[in-house]
Amino acid sequence: MNLTPKERERLTIFMAAELARRRKERGVKLNHPETVAYISDWACERAREGMSVAEIRQEATALLTREDVMDGVPELVDMVQVEPMFPDGTKLVTIHDPIRADTREQLEE
């Protein structure tokens, strides 16, 4: 299997995100790389499904809460940038302050 550098990068993000998803399901708090991978992978998948850049930026801020990540991670992850493939080509998606809520309940309000 011959993969381009972009395809290898995408697989690396997926693998890190998969590890993060499994840890999150078990109640393990995510570290910085896991948090970035989790958000990046989600954004790439939504782009592939045809969601707009604006929708991805908005909905990505509801993926994780402070309860889901280790102490200090929300401050470290002040921005996530990823270049996913949309149906009409690659675009830069920038998600500012992706971890805004302290708890899941705050997201549901």
Swiss-Prot record:
The keyword Cytoplasm applies. The keyword Hydrolase applies. One of its GO terms (molecular function) is nickel cation binding. It catalyses: urea + 2 H2O + H(+) = hydrogencarbonate + 2 NH4(+). It comes from the Archaea. SUPFAM superfamilies: Urease, gamma-subunit (SSF54111). Its main location: cytoplasm. Pathway: Nitrogen metabolism; urea degradation; CO(2) and NH(3) from urea (urease route): step 1/1. One of its GO terms (cellular component) is cytoplasm. Keywords: Cytoplasm, Hydrolase. Its EC number is 3.5.1.5. It is found in: Cytoplasm. GO terms for biological process: urea catabolic process. Heterotrimer of UreA (gamma), UreB (beta) and UreC (alpha) subunits. Three heterotrimers associate to form the active enzyme. PANTHER family: UREASE. Belongs to the urease gamma subunit family. This is Urease subunit gamma. It comes from Natronomonas pharaonis (strain ATCC 35678 / DSM 2160 / CIP 103997 / JCM 8858 / NBRC 14720 / NCIMB 2260 / Gabara) (Halobacterium pharaonis). The lineage of its organism: Archaea, Methanobacteriati, Methanobacteriota, Stenosarchaea group, Halobacteria.
